[in-house]
Amino acid sequence: LTDTQKELVEGENADPDYFGRDTGDASKDDARNQDDIGDNELLVVSFGTSFNDSRVKDIKGIEDALQAAYPDWSVRRAFTAQIIINHVQARDGEKIDNMQQAMDRAVENGVKNLVVQPTHLMHGAEYDEMMEMIDTYRDKFESVAVAEPLLGEVGSDATIINQDKEDVAKAVTAAAVKEAGYDSLDAAAADKVAFVFMGHGTSHTAKVSYSQMQTTMQTLGYDNVFIGTVEGKPEETACENVIEAVKAAGYTKVILRPLMVVAGDHANNDMA
């Protein structure tokens, strides 16, 4: 922990709210920081979350699914958010590797073939930093492969869409419609229901990905589906602008859904 973080959690001036609400049982998680990796490693890189239940269900869920799909590879974990790593370790005693620690662990264990699977949504700042770290280690392995983030390549402007974005748009919309109790998106629209998928938002140039997702929804004919962002970048996806768009389209009920890999702080606090 940094000195500032230590002041929050230790001594007479400790902040009792630093760790916030009860977020579940951390013992159900698996930091996947074991040695004895073998020749082949599949490193799953996530931003991370301090919400234990969400970490177990979402991040661990992805890691477990990958391990089941590729039993001949050792799945390991790295988080890119050091503040979350520190938070979880101080509160729960769970030690999660950051990127450098995970890469060092792979080298020390003699890994020959490294595949990196990010759970990031887009080519944003966290993805860029991950790539910078990987590039410094490439000569330590016989082969290194890095997967695209969920939404694929960014593209130059809001009109550029790709198959990855279309697949995600179809999947998240179908799940939202079903869980809302409708047989179809048109049936929801007939009830004046709109679906708003909220992303994190970013000042990175990758922010255009959110606009591209809105373009994708429109291209698919999903007229009552809107893309918003918690932090309001890009401007057209800021909450106030999305609210105005929903009102202008005549919808009277909104169902909010996270456009995030993990339902952590933003989903539980900002959206709620």
Report residues per predicted region.
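Extended amphipathic ligand-handling, pore-lining, and cofactor/metal-binding catalytic surfaces
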Residues: L1-I255, M260-A272
